[in-house]
Structure formats: structure tokens, C-alpha cells
Amino acid sequence: MTVLRDMPISFPGLFGAWEFNPDPVALHFGNGIYWYGIILAAAMLCGLLLAMKQAKRVGLTEDHVLDLVLWAVPCCIIGARLYYVIFYLDLYRTADGALDWGQMIAIWDGGIAIYGAVIAGVLVAIVYCRKKKLKLGAMTDVAAMGLMLGQCIGRWGNFMNREAFGAATTLPWRMRLWTSATEYIEVHPTFLYESLWNLVGVLLLVFVITGGRHFDGENTWFYFLWYGLGRTWVEGLRTDSLYLFDWTIMGEPIRVSQALSVAMVLVSAVMLVWHIKVRPHDPSELLVNRLAAENAAAEAEREVVAEELQEAVEPSVGTEKESEVTTDGSTD
């Protein structure tokens, strides 16, 4: 369903007659600078800063994170667009059925999907970690924190665009959007549901999960589990889902994101149980603990060398003093 972007947004069950009417375009010049783009940029920046701040906790440096992001961001944008185009391919055909390549790359007209970005990001991380000889699990663990914060913030771009909303509802927190000058719909604010869900997820990652990790990669699998659970729920409420071609289950079309989310939940749950309960890891295997042990051993070795040098210097000083005394005596 299409809603008007120049009409106000309200939450009548919470705030009565109060309305908010944001212009999707923040700056009107050229093709315009949209709030959606500004919010996505802010989301990426906040996610990057959090990941850099948390890097030391998993045994990495800020430079490791920054280097990866410089490669990942453009690839994630391409992945997000490609994913969307593949599942909405009919939108990018001309009247004679041929593919319209110009429209396919016109990302400024809208049309991206977060799962495409996640898939592209994982592939870039694999290549980067192999090239730099870094532990993939540690890198994706810190990336998971930044990604979830970015998703939490980024969903507010959907609010400014009046998109990614859910089905009709009468709940007190329903969101009112206008479909014409005289008609409106009241729907689930699914952008808000997902934003709050991700906020809880990033708080759990930063303050609970990371400090008690059993293995490198635990944050990553928790991210897939948590986000998958939330997205399975939220996607079931949305009215603008991408569908898996013409496939159905029990007569119902298959939502791409929901199917992928269920698969993510199952796989991540199995991986977490396997690595924590079935085949538990020794804490010393964590990259951060291994580096700490190596640094401690190196420091201990330096102290031993320093002590040996000190012991070698002290007898030499004593011998020199004895020589001076002998020399002085013979002179007298």
C-alpha cells in the first residue's frame, strides 16, 4: 500500500491529536539530500565508532576495524541493492520484458535490503581476514556489535520515508499514515519494533555476551540468532515483504526475509549449543586471551633479560672499584 510522504505521521493512541510531518528531503538542491541517506550515514558512523571502541575486547585494533569497513561499505551497498533487485526483478523490466539495467543501478530511487548487505559484509570479512591473517571469528564478533547498532539507528530512515510499516492494528501505539488527503490507515510501527529489538540486542552484546564469550564467533552467532528471531516476528507483520518468487507453503507466499531469518535462527542456535555445550572451548583459545598470554610471556622474558643484564653489570662495577683501590694504594 502506498502512503503520502507529504502528510503527517501521528500516534493517536499515545499522543492524541499531536502530529509530526517530516519532509523526507532534508536539503532541497540538485536531486535533494534525503533524511534516509543522512540517517543511514549516521548509522554507519555510529556502528563504526562502537566497533572500533570494542575492538580491543576481542583482541583486535581500531585500525583492523577501520581497514575492513573501508572495503566493506561499498560492497555492502552493492550487496543490499543486488539482493533487492533479484527478488523484485519484474520491477526492472521494460515494456517488452527486457531488463532495464539503468533502473537496476539507480539506487538513489530506493530499493535496498539489509540481508544483502550482511551477506556481502561476511564475504568481505572472510577475504580480508585471510589476507591479513586475522581470526575471522574475532573480527565478526566486533562487527556484529557495530552492525546491530547501525540497524537500530538506520530503521528511523524508514520512519522519515513513511515505509516498512506493518498491517492494520488498533493497538494503543498504532501509527497513523495518510493514503490520500481524506483517508488514512493505522498500522503497526514495525520500524520501531525492529529498532527497539536491535537496541536490546546491542546492549546484550556490549554488556553481557562479549564479556563472557566462550569462543571467537560467539557474538556473531548471537547476532544471527537475535536478529533472526526479531526479523521473523516483524516480517510477519509487514505488508511490503519481498517474496520468494512464486513459491508458496500451504497456499501462502514465502517471505524471503522470514525464510532466511528462520534458517539463521536454527543454524545459529545449533552452532551456539555445539560450541558452548557439546564441544566447549578452552578460554585460552580466545584471540584476546591468547594475545594477553603472549604479551605476558614476552614481558616476563624482558624482565628476565633485564635481571641478567643487571647481574652482569654489578660484578663488573665491583671489579672496577677494586682496581681503583689497588691503583691508589700502589701510588701511595
Where are these regions (language model features)?
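A feature for loop-to-transmembrane-helix boundaries and adjacent hydrophobic helices
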Residues: 1-332
